[in-house]
């Protein structure tokens, strides 16, 4: 604060989305880098390929860079940004964990993708539990899903599924 007023950069500003899906198979990606001389985006395999696509500086001179990509197949797409040759996360776009690191992603919906939409049906709960590992002695985390209507005080038994994510990601990949 300066003289009782918040600094301008501490205020929320309306920002256009960094990922937009204006039509099937089309994605618009935006990155804020006002001092950059070059911004690129590349997919991690999949429909975007590994090609570096050079983004164009916004004509509004507002620090944003943008690119529109077409023919992107439906599904989940990891991608990464390069600002003046340096790999960077886009803080304005969704960030997940894959390829052994935090990484940006987007999901291109398709005709058969309605199964993962938030539908109007009963939902269970997901909680993170912490425990001390008897092997390492360290605090670890696990995620517990309980079905709709589950009551911790109830004596009814429920089946258990133990699910461990494989190489390159972690357990959050199953719940986000």
Task: Write out the residue ranges for each language-model feature.
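Short substrate-entry loop that stabilizes the transition state in hydrolases
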Residues: 150-176
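Aromatic-rich carbohydrate-binding modules that target alpha-glucans
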Residues: 20-22, 28-74, 84-111, 146
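A short loop-to-beta-strand scaffold at the N-terminal edge of the catalytic core in hydrolase folds
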Residues: 136-153
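Hydrophobic loop/turn residues within beta-sheet-rich immunoglobulin-like superfamily modules
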Residues: 70-72, 134, 155
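Short, flexible loop/turn elements at secondary-structure junctions
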Residues: 35, 132-135, 148, 166-168
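Non-catalytic, glycine-rich low-complexity segments
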Residues: 1-33, 109-120
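Short, hydrophobic/aromatic-rich segments at coil-to-beta transitions
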Residues: 64, 121-129
């Amino acid at each position: 604060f300066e003289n009782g007023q918040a600094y301008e950069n501490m205020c929320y500003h309306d920002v256009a989305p960094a990922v937009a899906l204006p039509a099937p198979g089309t994605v618009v990606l935006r990155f804020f880098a006002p001092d950059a001389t070059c911004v690129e985006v590349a997919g991690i395999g999949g429909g975007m390929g590994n090609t570096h696509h050079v983004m164009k500086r916004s004509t509004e001179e507002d620090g944003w860079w943008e690119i529109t990509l077409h023919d992107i197949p439906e599904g989940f797409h990891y991608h990464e940004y390069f600002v003046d040759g340096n790999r960077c996360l886009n803080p304005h776009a969704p960030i997940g964990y894959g390829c052994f690191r935090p990484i940006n992603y987007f999901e291109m919906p398709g005709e058969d993708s309605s199964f993962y939409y938030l539908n109007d049906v009963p939902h269970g709960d997901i909680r993170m539990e912490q425990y001390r590992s008897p092997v390492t002695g360290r605090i670890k985390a696990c995620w517990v899903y309980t079905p709709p209507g589950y009551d911790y005080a109830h004596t009814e038994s429920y089946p258990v599924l133990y699910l461990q994510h494989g190489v390159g990601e972690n357990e959050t990949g199953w719940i986000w």
